[in-house]
Structures are given as structure tokens and as C-alpha cells.
Amino acid sequence: MGQARTTGLRGMAEAVTRPDQILDIAAGQFRTKGYAAVSMRDIATEAGMRTPSLYYHFPSKDDLVMAVMDRGIVVVREAVMAALDDLPPDAATVTRLDTAMRAHLRALHGASDYTSANVRIFGQLPEAWRRANMPERRAYQAIWSALLAPTCAADPAVLPMRVAFVIGALNATLEWVDPARIDIEALADQVTQVLRHGVLGEGAA
């Protein structure tokens, strides 16, 4: 959000022609204030543009919200996939899980507001919008299903619950971590240890 506010005619022209900047600002506002408390005027003001100019890029708040929501999943999915791609093909299950959990946490608590905005406001959205975001969510859940399947070999029926639990536990760190004092690597150490040894047990070895 460091490039959020611009001033003068040149800055306003840049804001009007940069949808990505608008999305950055919207994601930051949704993350900090929630869905209902954010208006198109709020976003336009922070972007240094007039509200009608904002509607040129995003015809409604619905369009803006859904763009932020979809990007929130894409950001974390790409982060996890990139981290996994860096591992050797024969990496152990526990190594792949540890890598994926760390990548998820870095995306969630890192510089981008998109993933944390998605997590925070998903439950605040109308049901139709939640359904619209589900294809992206299912694509991401499929990655975790593949990662966690070896830990459920003895009872495959528990796999969906285990996927939901792990993703939910990672996302829940938004609720109890102080963003002003966060050390992402220390957090990753703590959370991955708990999930690997307390939840996944010997099946993750």
C-alpha cells in the first residue's frame, strides 16, 4: 500500500490508468475494515481519483470485490506452487508439507493484502459471491489434497477434513498474530511444528 495515494494531475492520471493499483488499495481496505465498511468513494479517495473514474475500471463494488477475492487465492496458490517446484522431485512428504505451509504463511502475512483480504471477508460476502470464488478455492484445495493424501493412506475418508483443518489453521493465524510484531519465519516454525507433530503425526514422515 506504499503507492496508494497520489497527488496532482499527473498522479491522478496514473491512478486512473492503473487498475492494479486500485486493486491493491481495495485489498488493503477490505483487509483492515471488512467488506461492508468499505465504499467505492473510500477506495477512490485513497487512490487520488474521483469516484466516477473508479467506475470506469470497475463498474460496481461487486466487480472490485470479486477481482480482489480471486487474486487472493491466485497469490497464495502461485506462492505455494513456486515453493514446491523448487524442491527435488523425490522430496519427502514432510518436506513438501513444511514447504507448502511456510509459503502459505508468507503469502498470508507478507507484503500483499490480497490473500489476507480474501480470508477476512469471505464469510461477510453474499452467498452468490462466495460461490463465485469457490472454483479458485477448490483449485487451491486440490494442491493440499495431493500433499496430504500420503498422511491419510490408512483412512482416505479423512482427507477432506484434514485439508480443511490445515488450511483453516494456517488462515486462523490472522486472528491471533500481532501484525506489528510478526516474525514470519518464527511463526512458520511454530505453526508447522504444531501441525506436523500435533495433527499429522507419524503419517507425515
Question: PLM features: residue spans?
Answer:
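Short hydrophobic clusters on alpha-helical segments that form packing/core surfaces
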Residues: I22-F30, G72, H104, L195
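Helix-turn-helix
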Residues: R18-Q21, I25, Q29-D63, A67
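Amphipathic alpha-helical packing segments from all-alpha helical-bundle domains
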Residues: V74-M81, E127-C152, P160-A164, D189
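Hydrophobic alpha-helical connector segments
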Residues: A67, M81-G110
